[in-house]
Amino acid sequence: MENQLAKSTEERTFQYQDSLPSLPVPSLEESLKKYLESVKPFANEEEYKNTEAIVWKFQNGIGEKLQQKLLQRAKGRRNWLEEWWLNVAYLDVRIPSQLNVNFGGPASHIEHYWPPKEGTQLERGSISLWHNLNYWQLLRKEKLAVEKVGNTPLDMNQFRMLFSTCKIPGITRDSIINYFRTESEGHSPSHLAVLCRGRVFVFDVMHEGYLMTAPEIQRQLTYIQKKCHSEPDGPGVAALTTEERTRWAKAREYLISLNPENLTILEKIQSSLLVFCLDDDSPHVTPEDYSQVSAKILNGDPTVRWGDKSYNLIAFSNGVFGSNCDHAPFDAMVLVKVCYYVDENILENEGRWKGSEKVRDIPVPEELVFTVDEKVLNDINQAKAQYFKQVSDLQLVVYAFTSFGKKLTKEKQLHPDTFIQLALQLAYYRLHGRPGCCYETAMTRLFYHGRTETVRPCTVEAVNWCQSMQNPSTSLLERKHMMLEAFAKHNKMMKDCSTGKGFDRHLLGLSLIAKEEGLPVPELFTDPLFSRSGGGGNFVLSTSLVGYLRVQGVMVPMVHNGYGFFYHIRDDRFVVSCSAWKSCPETDAEKLVQQVFHAFCDMMQLMEMPHL
């Protein structure tokens, strides 16, 4: 073990980036075969035959030409998907991204040394910030261990995007600006932005070449809070980041035209390490029920979140914490890693600051005061109005299932992630009486700048098993057999998707090549079964495993009649979050989660069946 630790400090965080394999282009025939299999649960015989004919025509016609063009594209770049994915999945999207695209999550400090307690916001906030800043320094020094699967390194590029990164709204397409540099690359910004009661402050976290201590950070936060609590609220320019993207882009251009100083202020916020949000709310939270705090993280006060920042760290009045992140620059596992690092350090230090109490003579924080006029104030009010309207429609529950967890599923030789996915399939089937097309995230970080691929858990095998569970004449043994077949299928799909053999991103690539070539949209993509099975961003169940650490995530559904279902796995429990829109009469997040918990028990009961 000692050797391993010594070795890990010698490895630099980004040292393998140049030697990672390029993202492969899968075989056309294989992808189409997998696609056909995935639409089966949503088609009758006639519809399936029709789609089969469309696929065959595509494979032997335009599909082959598009595949050749895609292979050409892949020759010239190490990741043929990267730029496309960023644009299509994030930067071209015009709907407000803060609520619809961002992800968030509550900190689990409440489970040990930091239960909710009024009057602790600033002291705890400064300790949490200090650990976050240590993580930033590890990244700058490239001392963060390279993540690996076995001995194979994973792409670490997304970790460059955690700090000093921001999305900039554009009229038709947004852009991402990243100011972070490692120490060997040169200067990197070292200031924090703090939002409080509609006002914006910044201060440098380095003083005379050293990182501020937690008591020094606390002094800065106290100065800001006292000032904000004894003076009128600011205009809340941050609320503009909740707006529809083109609207926000125009409002931003107008803001800059009012006074060039406004651009300087925007750039200071954009380049800040992270945005620390002092929130006056005191949401309820327990280790078994994170619903209220999670909702506030996703849909809280828009004047104290900068929706375009890659990292908003939120401190509530009762000393409870959470994060809200723009999804464009990175996927949730980056946030999971920093949150876990901070939580472990808080745990190790019993929630206290154990360093020096000395506070150096440090310049007070600088307030950034925007020049605003009637039009800007109107824009802010309009942004808030549309934000609160959508926010009031969100239903979100986050509960812990504590009867068992990973330990028991492993004992039964069941993959815990697959266990939850199949429970969700059964729960949806029981609640809605039909199969639910489902998106589960697989990671493709084995490849250069790899991000994600789609696993489609609603397989023929899963549906057959769900039907057997609802059919009183099917024996328990048959049900168990069918369940294990569904497990095997899911595990194989996950393996394929993680190793570059998925088909969703491949089909996206083929459709984008057609678009770039000015060709008509191939029939494959206009076939009703394409969208009914989830294609084109139509998955009714949008899901992801957040990991095996004490970190939970939340996101809104992908479609109006769908659910956002995110979960993490521990030895003794499964923690799940489920979101839905109240204005959709057929969805109910609370009921779905109860059905999932019910399914967990039913599945475990099947495993108690002796092998005959």
UniProtKB/Swiss-Prot annotation:
Residues with N6-succinyllysine modification: K40, K57, K406
Subunit composition and interactions: Monomer.
Protein EC: 2.3.1.137
UniProt entry keywords in alphabetical sequence: Acetylation, Acyltransferase, Fatty acid metabolism, Lipid metabolism, Peroxisome, Transferase, Transport
Keyword presence, Acetylation: yes
Subcellular location: Peroxisome
Alphabetized Pfam families for the sequence: Carn_acyltransf
Molecular-function GO term, any one: carnitine O-octanoyltransferase activity
Annotated residues for binding of (R)-carnitine: Y439, T441, T452
Name listed for the protein in its UniProt record: Peroxisomal carnitine O-octanoyltransferase
List of catalytic residues: H327
Highest taxon listed in the record's lineage: Eukaryota
InterPro entries: Carn_acyl_trans, Carn_acyl_trans_N, CAT-like_dom_sf, Cho/carn_acyl_trans, Cho/carn_acyl_trans_2
List of residues that carry N6-acetyllysine: K406
SUPFAM superfamilies in alphabetical order: CoA-dependent acyltransferases
Annotated function: Beta-oxidation of fatty acids. The highest activity concerns the C6 to C10 chain length substrate.
Cysteine-cysteine disulfides: none
Broadest EC class assigned to this enzyme: transferase
Residues with PTM N-acetylmethionine: M1
Family: Belongs to the carnitine/choline acetyltransferase family.
Positions annotated to bind CoA: K406, K410, E411, K412, Q413, L414, H415, P416, D417
Catalytic activity: octanoyl-CoA + (R)-carnitine = O-octanoyl-(R)-carnitine + CoA; 4,8-dimethylnonanoyl-CoA + (R)-carnitine = O-4,8-dimethylnonanoyl-(R)-carnitine + CoA
Cellular component, GO, one term: peroxisome
